[in-house]
Amino acid sequence: MNRTESKIKFVGLHAHSVAGSIFDAIGFPNAHMDFCYQNGGEALALTDHGNMNGLPYQVLHCKEMLAAGKKFKPIFGCEAYFIPSVDEWREEYTKAMEDKKRSRAAKKDAQSGATIEDEGSSKKTQGILRRRRHLVLVAQNQTGLNNLFKLVSESYKAENFYRYPRIDYKLLKKYSEGIIASSACLGGVYAGNYWENREDGDEAVMNAMRETTKNMIDVFGDRWYAEIQWNNIKEQHELNQYVIRIAKEFGVKLISTADSHYPNPEAWKDRELYKRLGWLGKSKPSYADEGSELPAGVEEIGYE
């Protein structure tokens, strides 16, 4: 493995473990922490999807490391599932259920030749209802940690949960104190602006990102960070350019993350197999255009 030395210490602020990112990441937090320490790291954030189940592992292993004379700081976080407004989503959901009832009636009519169902519109509505974006949240202090606990708990309540635990701007405003937030990955809030507007051109993407940035700064102030990542996905590099532009425009600080899903480079194949078990073959990776065999090397996967 090639290693680049730098005077600036890299601190991973976006990482996943098997403790909280089931069928997405492998390796318990202690394995991630050990690899980080062995490669000169002094701190690591754990940001599993929608939960903080890995926190006890972080705390216990950090105590073991300190007892062995290894100075290391665990950073507590979560990659939350975000939608702008649960209330607005609920209105959309109610409307969709009414449309679904009408659709069933329309299908019966269609069978008799009376009408034709608008299948495209139905699928579009389902897409909106299921849409959610990633948002990385990291505790800055004890107040932030307490607020993270509250946010995670709130996200699992019936009024917020739909397929996944979700939070919105209203909840973030209530519990934002002491929390650092960043825009996450290709599934993140800035990425959502990119995916939804890129066909309409450069300015459409930027305008959507401006709106997101204003809202996030309103919630977090200078604790809002623009996140870029480095992998082999073409769209990631396109997104990075937009993120850099928006950061410069608003004076938002940039952070670079690994978004790691396995504790060491050699574990990439194990993680790929684990993912496939979770999806039961329903989702074909981008590299698997022919057959279902694993790629020869990690570079063929595209990510991480």
Model-derived features with residue positions:
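Phosphodiester-processing cores and adjacent nucleic acid-binding clamps
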Residues: 1-304
